[in-house]
């Protein structure tokens, strides 16, 4: 799984060298942010049901046409699948926070996602709206510390950009 540490080691190994001072500084910075990432992961895990529901609700409020006949959310079963997908991606964001890298999203969330959604007539813009809402509803210090919020928002930004 890709993280700052595994990426640094892989790059050094591929070049046949020891990690450089700047490589080690990058790893050290990643380790120093670990407490904030773990706080964000814990807060997300303990509130994930509300986060997923609010994000999904925001998506269907913004894209109400999705509930029209022939659209991605034209039955309760399809709506439930959309919420399931939002929950899946939020778990991947949580995993990214824990490992300190984008590996979980890259490996389990993005590879082929756009093609699958296009085939199933699921607009990625709706998912992007869900994750933007989840990012924007964050309130520091109500939800988490400022640094944890930076880590949380950064991972959601990565996901949003990857799906856009």
UniProtKB/Swiss-Prot annotation:
GO terms for biological process: photosynthesis. InterPro entries: Globin-like_sf (IPR009050), Phycobilisome_asu/bsu (IPR012128), Phycobilisome_asu/bsu_sf (IPR038719). Signal peptide: none annotated. It holds the Pfam family Phycobilisome. Contains two covalently linked bilin chromophores. (2R,3E)-phycoerythrobilin 2 binds at residue 139. Belongs to the phycobiliprotein family. Light-harvesting photosynthetic bile pigment-protein from the phycobiliprotein complex. This is R-phycoerythrin alpha chain. The lineage of its organism: Eukaryota, Rhodophyta, Bangiophyceae, Bangiales, Bangiaceae. The gene is cpeA.
């Amino acid at each position: 799984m890709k993280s700052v540490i595994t990426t640094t080691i892989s790059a050094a190994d591929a070049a046949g060298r020891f990690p450089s001072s700047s490589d080690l500084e990058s790893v050290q910075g990643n380790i120093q942010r670990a407490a904030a990432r773990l706080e964000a992961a814990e807060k997300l895990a303990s509130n994930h049901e509300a986060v997923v529901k609010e994000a999904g609700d925001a998506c269907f409020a913004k894209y109400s046409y999705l509930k029209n006949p022939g659209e991605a959310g034209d039955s309760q079963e399809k709506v439930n699948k959309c919420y399931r997908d939002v929950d899946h991606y939020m778990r991947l964001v949580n995993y990214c926070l824990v490992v300190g890298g984008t590996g979980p999203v890259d490996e389990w969330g993005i590879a082929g996602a756009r093609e699958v959604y296009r085939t199933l007539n699921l607009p990625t813009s709706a998912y992007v709206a869900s994750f933007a809402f989840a990012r924007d509803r964050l309130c520091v210090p109500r939800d988490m510390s400022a640094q944890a919020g930076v880590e949380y928002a950064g991972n959601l930004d990565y996901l949003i950009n990857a799906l856009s």
